[in-house]
């Protein structure tokens, strides 16, 4: 067989022509040590702070420390398979998570990946986990109400859209209950809710999901879960994942509500990361930038100016205290960042006052300007009346000889405390809250025993729903009590008084 030179050269030419010239270039480094979700990597000289890294097995990591001869990275996922000497690639991207309408009704992990077994999330939109909060020019003062459906909050500690209101209290005082009721109360409205569970038991998260489904609230809610069994880096990043999803709605001119449950556990996870990264510890072994950890997160919740779409992102961070100590390190940090706090007290909770809000220590610094006018009219003196009642009740324990005025004030105070109680998962619309507080302030409930007031309230709502729906509609539309509406309410309450028997 004869081999001709032309044929050989033709074959070589053809192969050169068809040769693929694409060469994938990636900057890689080598793991020099790994443990507890932290890897030290040599060779990634050009890595950026917060950059996404690619570990073997498709696991992601995030650069946190940039040192002279190595970088410290948090591994965002299961790290048991990763070992010393493995190769790590740079991606050149900052950590991103999926955002958009497709996430509504889903349960996702701290990286935005679905964990509810309902298949993949179809979205092509992504948002950076760490972005700068809107500047002063892009903001507007809070002026629209964010109704929680809880009488004690909407009347005395009102929350506005774009506000950051802290919910603080010991364990088992109903902090999550307040947050879940607020989500349920947004049903039929235009608010998208995001619930971020940080370091909680999986059973607790499952319970929250089933309660929200039961009340039809998952139709407008996203749940981000970094449970107790997940590595510290995921617990640390989950609030930022949640707020990134919320910012998408805020910047689209919509309204969103985000709940962080709770930020104490995020601070603990961040402390663990920082100590493993050998950053110097400060007070209570927290790193020096633990204030910035929370401030940069909460500053991203705001009311945006009309020029930027007039959207809003309202934040309800939760902080757990130890034995009611509000002056500990993390609680004081978050109190100073937020626009007010709702303080829940275990003594009140165990004495049957639920929601267990301590009116004296709870405050809303900007919500007053967002409160519905009708509520402002009826609830203006409520806080003062309750404070006077508490003071009077303390004195009344010492002596039994009380004059008639004092006895009346004590009786009125007892009734006010009773009508502000509310069962869980039963938010009350604003116009009905106005009715019951109006009735209490104007002496319509003074003649009834305290034990009959729960029934009085239920029957009053039914009476107005069935026979005085026009009064409720007027209150809902006008959002204020003028002489005409006041006359109608008084007449209706007098009519109801004749029918109601204690």
UniProtKB/Swiss-Prot annotation:
It comes from the Bacteria. The record marks 362 as: Required for activity. It is found in: Cell inner membrane. Its main location: membrane. This is ATP synthase subunit alpha. Produces ATP from ADP in the presence of a proton gradient across the membrane. The alpha chain is a regulatory subunit. ATP binds at residues 169-176. GO terms for cellular component: plasma membrane; proton-transporting ATP synthase complex. It is a peripheral membrane protein. It catalyses: ATP + H2O + 4 H(+)(in) = ADP + phosphate + 5 H(+)(out).
